[in-house]
From Swiss-Prot:
Any Gene Ontology CC annotation: ribonucleoprotein complex
Family: Belongs to the universal ribosomal protein uS8 family.
MF GO annotations: rRNA binding; structural constituent of ribosome
Protein known as: Small ribosomal subunit protein uS8
Gene Ontology annotations of biological process type: translation
Lineage of producing organism: Bacteria, Bacillati, Cyanobacteriota, Cyanophyceae, Synechococcales
Oligomer status and interactors: Part of the 30S ribosomal subunit. Contacts proteins S5 and S12.
PROSITE patterns noted in UniProt: RIBOSOMAL_S8
InterPro entries on file: Ribosomal_uS8 (IPR000630), Ribosomal_uS8_CS (IPR047863), Ribosomal_uS8_sf (IPR035987)
Keywords from the UniProt entry: Ribonucleoprotein, Ribosomal protein, RNA-binding, rRNA-binding
Cited function: One of the primary rRNA binding proteins, it binds directly to 16S rRNA central domain where it helps coordinate assembly of the platform of the 30S subunit.
């Protein structure tokens, strides 16, 4: 079956893996998913990611990050904002701040996928893909 929204699929896999306290999770490989994983790694929400598999079966392996003895997930919430049925765009002046700057909005811009902080520095707006905090 074809996946109509691979970004939502990625975020759901991350959310489910965090709830079950898994160390890693597998996500189908795409350029967009790789870019989102890179932003999550740069912002400190995941330890690392790598590519595995061959051909059509290639996927990303994300190492999730936890803190403390009780393994509290670093990613507390992941919300999809712009969806295939309703795209949400923002200009550089109206870039959202998630939880007063504690969270991250992941933005797809003309200069690539980046966090809201990087988009402010670059002075670009774009499609708001998701919020992570």
């Amino acid at each position: 079956m074809a996946n109509t929204d691979p970004i939502s699929d990625m975020l759901t896999r991350i959310r489910n893996a965090c709830e079950k306290r898994h160390q890693t999770t597998n996500i189908p490989l795409s350029r967009m998913n790789r870019s989102i994983a890179k932003v999550l790694e740069q912002e400190g929400f995941i330890d690392q990611f790598s590519e595995a598999g061959e051909g059509v079966q290639k996927h990303l392996v994300l190492s999730l990050k936890y803190s403390g003895k009780q393994k509290v997930p670093t990613i507390r919430s992941v919300q999809r904002v712009s969806k295939p049925g309703l795209r949400i765009y923002t200009n550089r002046r109206d870039l959202p701040k998630v939880l007063g700057g504690l969270g991250v909005a992941i933005i797809s811009t003309s200069k690539g996928v980046m966090s809201d902080r990087d988009a402010r520095k670059e002075g670009v707006g774009g499609e708001v893909l998701c919020y992570v905090y």
